[in-house]
């Protein structure tokens, strides 16, 4: 998909449920996720089941005319041709999913020391957050259950691993807390973060591993230090529950989505509100019942950091360019709940209330040299450090995303 083109539906996965299940209840796909290397896709297909699907999809799921790499390719460095679809029976409704990054060498040594009988942690791990407050940790390659983490008193709504490969996991729950777990130490709970007054809907760790964002039902967004596990600041601006959040790939931006029909883009270092993206009806309506039909469900950044994808209750998937205040593309979808980009770009996955997953084309653009330089610099410079540089004001504005 080129910039400016409408997203095309590439493929759709539908759950194959046993006949004893009621197809109209507990069938929602609350979460979808790609593994960091793009070799696996996971989706909660309802009725306590998570599907692990090797990527790219088998040919029967791909429409004619779409070019996809085969897992049997000679250029496949990780032997993906041998990967098989897995079905994980979690025993409870699954709300949150998160893949670990490939573990760092120190984490592998710690895991081997504390888990001598467990599979090699050089393989991927999937965490699942359940309806009863439990978190189950699975080894992706084999589908084996590795750990059961207990502590939350209500639904575990979201999960996030540190991108560094340290196997630190953060969970967000309806019990109004976030919890920090160290999988290197038998899943030991190392911290409980309190302060939210209502359900915590989501959590996201910045790519540089310095900050944790959490969002909840009391219209608030909290930013925490991942070093000291203390509250840095509260972000205020939404008028209703905040249900989704994501950091840009360089950690310089934070986006939050709310039932108030807006996405707010923040500077997480200063707390400044940079812009708002409003999800209005495409066609005017006289029916007051439709006033809140554009409530947001999910927001995510593209891998290169130039686009956002949002899913709303008005049956639309929207794609936004950072520099514009209106969507650059739309796609019709019914009952959307969540979305995520493929790690290497070009594809968006969305989950729905009926347990289906759809894959859409996403913009593929060659990032400008200016953006690549900004992204590289912001990966290790905070906003305050940029503002302290002896450079022209216009350059500072560009590097801090005040201009594009």
From Swiss-Prot:
Record gene name: Wsb2
InterPro entries: G-protein_beta_WD-40_rep (IPR020472), SOCS_box (IPR001496), SOCS_box-like_dom_sf (IPR036036), WD40/YVTN_repeat-like_dom_sf (IPR015943), WD40_repeat_CS (IPR019775), WD40_repeat_dom_sf (IPR036322), WD40_rpt (IPR001680), WSB_SOCS-box_domain (IPR051983)
Taxonomic placement: Eukaryota, Metazoa, Chordata, Craniata, Vertebrata
Gene3D superfamilies registered for this protein in UniProt: SOCS box, YVTN repeat-like/Quinoprotein amine dehydrogenase
Domain of life from the UniProt record: Eukaryota
Stated role: May be a substrate-recognition component of a SCF-like ECS (Elongin-Cullin-SOCS-box protein) E3 ubiquitin ligase complex which mediates the ubiquitination and subsequent proteasomal degradation of target proteins.
Keyword terms of this UniProt record: Repeat, Ubl conjugation pathway, WD repeat
Keyword Lyase set for record: no
SOCS box domain: residues covered: 356-404
Protein name listed in UniProt: WD repeat and SOCS box-containing protein 2
